[in-house]
Amino acid sequence: MWCLHCNSERTQSLLELELDSGVEGEAPSSETGTSLDSPSAYHQGPLVPGSSLSPDHYEHTSVGAYGLYAGPGPQQRTRRPRLQHSTSVLRKQAEEEAIKRSRSLSESYELSSDLQDKQVEMLERKYGGRLVTRHAARTIQTAFRQYQMNKNFERLRSSMSENRMSRRIVLSNMRMQFSFEGPEKVHSSYFEGKQVSVTNDGSQLGALVPSECGDLSDPALKSPAPSSDFADAITELEDAFSRQVKSLAESIDDALNCRSLHSEEVPASDTARARDTEPKPGLHGMDHRKLDEMTASYSDVTLYIDEEELSPPLPLSQAGDRPSSTESDLRLRSGGAAQDYWALAHKEDKADTDTSCRSTPSLERPEPRLRVEHLPLLTIEPPSDSSVELSDRSDRSSLKRQSAYERSLGGQQGSPKHGPHGGPPKGLPREEPELRPRPPRPLESHLAINGSANRQSKSESDYSDGDNDSINSTSNSNDTINCSSESSSRDSLREQTLSKQTYHKETRNSWDSPAFSNDVIRKRHYRIGLNLFNKKPEKGIQYLIERGFVPDTPVGVAHFLLQRKGLSRQMIGEFLGNRQKQFNRDVLDCVVDEMDFSAMELDEALRKFQAHIRVQGEAQKVERLIEAFSQRYCVCNPGVVRQFRNPDTIFILAFAIILLNTDMYSPNVKPERKMKLEDFVKNLRGVDDGEDIPRETLIGIYERIRKRELKTNEDHVSQVQKVEKLIVGKKPIGSLHHGLGCVLSLPHRRLVCYCRLFEVPDPNKPQKLGLHQREIFLFNDLLVVTKIFQKKKNSVTYSFRQSFSLYGMQVLLFENQYYPNGIRLTSAVPGADIKVLINFNAPNPQDRKKFTDDLRESVAEVQEMEKHRIESELEKQKGVVRPSMSQCSSLKKESGNGTLSRACLDDSYASGEGLKRSALSSSLRDLSEAGKRGRRSSAGSLESNVEFQPFQPPQPPVLCS
């Protein structure tokens, strides 16, 4: 449970963890505050004669036993208890400061998995054992989240005057040219391509939205007209909106095509400004006024304004000498948007700078930032009631947007990072690779039954990057990768590559280093990125962007989240629900833009949305996800929105549906306490600006939810949960390495393969054929050994035997007269003694080869992840630069088959030996014997709740591999 994973050094109670981390609206505890055991908190003001604590009162007080007062005054105190309580206050303050200090240190340093598991174990030991603590944590978490959801729902109901949904819909969807405000709030618009955005109180934000075309506002638009003048012309107003938007796409295309004919004639330094403000000599029949009108319309359409903040976009003056075409124009715009996310506010003052080549791997940027047109290009939805027309336009817009962003990434993937400012490389020929929108490739499932595995060679292209499905992640295909060559300057690229460890899409023949030509390494890095995402989404996205697996634009990340397998849908929701980071909010907007909710009931549209994104967790994140969904639903169904007085009603109703689904299908809610139809209707009374939602609508929603739960589609965690249910029987609890007592299914854990082997207690003694049969479940970080417990016609159950962490594991082969297909697993953690974990014998050589290949690759993946974690911490705390690709090439050569030699591991960890040992606290080193460098063998994982049973095999025979 998340509430048990506390990184503080001082263990705390579960209630402390919950209250300190999650309770909203509660003032944080003051460091100078009084203690809980100090009665009446002591009057902290100056003592006056009239005060109950004035010295006059002390003359009449008598001290009783233990310093308690015996006088008549209930508020009178003696001096001695005051000193005692003051000492208690100071002690409490010191403890609180220690807790805060340890929390700040733990947040800045990422502990290894075994240290995190050790912290959880210590909490469990302190508060009554594993079962008691986990049950308490689960109860607290469920109750607190339900309380927060209910409180947020009541807050949203009571604050309808805020009109947050109306404001966001009008501002962020100006491309619709359609206002959901009432007749009394609609103001004049300049229909010839210009638009006036209106706030909730009727005041104008500006006569024209600031855009690239400069200030084209009309003085007549500065003052709003009386609302009575427009109350009689609403129909005409909406018709004008519709006509304008229907012709908007064609006007934009014509304008772009005409501008692209003579884009080379405009000086590079003035390209962006001239494109929007100056007429071109070859516009053939298009006068200046019409061009300005269409330019203003185009700017209004593509500009995204959030929370009523209007800021001018960054000047796009880095046009360069690129081919004059519509594609170049799109690249310029999308490149500027990408630059806004990844640049650290550096100004480019050179004409030959290509903004689309910038790819700084930081997912965060300073808060004082300018908001530019970072929403997808050409996302135009007309306000037509026809769902067919809207769906068709939405699909075409999505294709245009995807193509534009993929073109803008051509230079980014082929150019490595440059210097501290991430400046683009100079002197590189700008070649446009042919990137086509490609539907997601169906991924093969890989479940090796009895050691057999079905593999298929995969040829990767674009951003597929050896993506694995939820079961198989170790397809070791060495086929040639179809990559696009971004530059012909190999020497400059290789020189830049040495300064930053990353992946660049180059043809196989253009690299001399075998690390780049090894498809196994490439796929391993991709899986590591998935694992990091499933642990910490922001860190995983940054890792994948750094290595070129994911475009560094909101649209590219949105496509990755929707199309790729191996991502936890729970973590997708965590990433998209993050309100603190602008990039996450933009990715969420792009994700919902890819979904079409036209002609769908609200609950069915919400079902489609939740199928891709798990809507649960903290109430604030759930609110953010539902808000984005409601916005998109209003865009896709303007006819439905007209039925309500306020678009906020859609948001409130969607939030109520989530509460209904949680209440109806939560196992913690008793059947007699589940929400009834009348309760559901009662909760939604008066939410539509004082009016009730039609009862028939609410009844239909309630019945559909009652018949069918809102569920999230299966991911790789679903299969791990199925395996967890199959493992039954006694699971010993109480030792350091627990059994499968509670949780095996975690967001980052996926099933690699399953096979049948035979355990060998003594390799020097024969045993009967088929004796000690074991069913092996190999996960990406754990090896679980089970035995068949019961067989039925349609199901098999397994009893748990042993489990081993893959970190520090070595896979060896042995053969003798008794066991021709022997497999030996040893612990090879640096600095620790080599320990034989277990011996197996495979039924045949083919099964042995397939199992050992998968196991070695999984071990190498775990080793690489731990190495990446240590390097990241060294960079963060000590400023140590990661080793270059050339320095790591020898290590990666050895780890290509999944086996790292003992000396290689020692060398990799000895690089930071000059630093403090605390800086490399990557393990339970401090808990092992004194004088030993390295970490002791963590033969089980607390995180997976697996029992480790000590096994002492006899002396191993001579290995012959």
Curated annotation (Swiss-Prot):
Q: Which CDD domains match?
A: PH_IQSEC, Sec7
Q: Which Gene3D superfamilies match?
A: 1.10.220.20, Arf Nucleotide-binding Site Opener,domain 2 (1.10.1000.11), Pleckstrin-homology domain (PH domain)/Phosphotyrosine-binding domain (PTB) (2.30.29.30)
Residues modified to Phosphotyrosine: 909
Composition bias, kind Low complexity: at what positions?
469-487
Q: Please give the residue ranges the record annotates as the region Disordered.
A: 21-113, 263-291, 310-332, 347-515, 920-961
Per UniProt, subcellular location reads as: Cytoplasm; Nucleus; Postsynaptic density; Cytoplasmic vesicle, Secretory vesicle, Synaptic vesicle
Segments of skewed composition (Pro residues): 951-961
What this protein is reported to do is described as: Guanine nucleotide exchange factor for ARF1 and ARF6. Guanine nucleotide exchange factor activity is enhanced by lipid binding. Accelerates GTP binding by ARFs of all three classes. Guanine nucleotide exchange protein for ARF6, mediating internalization of beta-1 integrin. Involved in neuronal development. In neurons, plays a role in the control of vesicle formation by endocytoc cargo. Upon long term depression, interacts with GRIA2 and mediates the activation of ARF6 to internalize synaptic AMPAR receptors.
The protein here is known as: IQ motif and SEC7 domain-containing protein 1
Q: What is the species listed in this Swiss-Prot or TrEMBL entry? A: Mus musculus (Mouse)
